[in-house]
A protein has these predicted regions:
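N-terminal leader/signal peptides at the extreme start of proteins
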Residues: 1-2
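Flexible, solvent-exposed loop/hinge segments and secondary-structure transition points
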Residues: 5-9, 13, 17-21, 25-26, ...
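Short amphipathic alpha-helical segments at helix boundaries and their inter-helical linkers
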Residues: 116-133
């Protein structure tokens, strides 16, 4: 009888610990972190939504599926397939295709890539370009070429 009570007590203890852990790890902690993110990093916490002409057109954090030859394309070889950034080398390698498709001078496209280049943290990584921002810069700079995308 004593052993049975002891086993029941341990079972209740185990269930209580599991429920407490579930409550803390599954509800309290995520709500706390989400609340702190909304307070200190509201733009990032909401996905860095990009607005164009008053409409949401994408996120700076997730690659968009640009397939037309008149736009820069994101990396298709990233592990997740949603990497929003490309290297400078990748951006420069796409310039001839865009120049052929749009007639925009190569120098202007090079300048556009340079203006939209982001640095890195100290010595880590290499400079990169956000594809969505770069394509929106093209649409803004050349409204006659990209008039169906405004």
């Amino acid at each position: 009888m004593q052993t049975n009570k002891k086993q029941n007590w341990r079972f209740r203890q185990a269930i209580s610990l599991a429920l407490f852990s579930l409550l803390i790890c599954g509800i309290v902690f995520p709500l706390l972190i989400t609340g702190l993110a909304q307070i200190f990093f509201p733009n990032q916490a909401n996905g860095e939504i990009v607005q164009f002409n008053g409409q949401a057109v994408g996120s700076n954090l997730i690659a968009q599926n640009f397939t037309l030859t008149i736009f820069f394309h994101p990396r298709n070889d990233s592990a997740s397939g949603v990497d929003p950034d490309i290297t400078l080398q990748d951006a420069y390698s796409q310039i001839p295709r865009i120049q052929d498709a749009t007639g925009i001078p190569t120098d202007a496209l090079n300048q556009m890539v340079n203006q939209n280049t982001e640095g890195t943290y100290w010595v880590f990584g290499s400079p990169y370009v956000n594809v969505l921002r770069l394509n929106l810069a093209l649409v803004r700079a050349y409204p006659l070429i990209y008039n169906g995308f405004q």
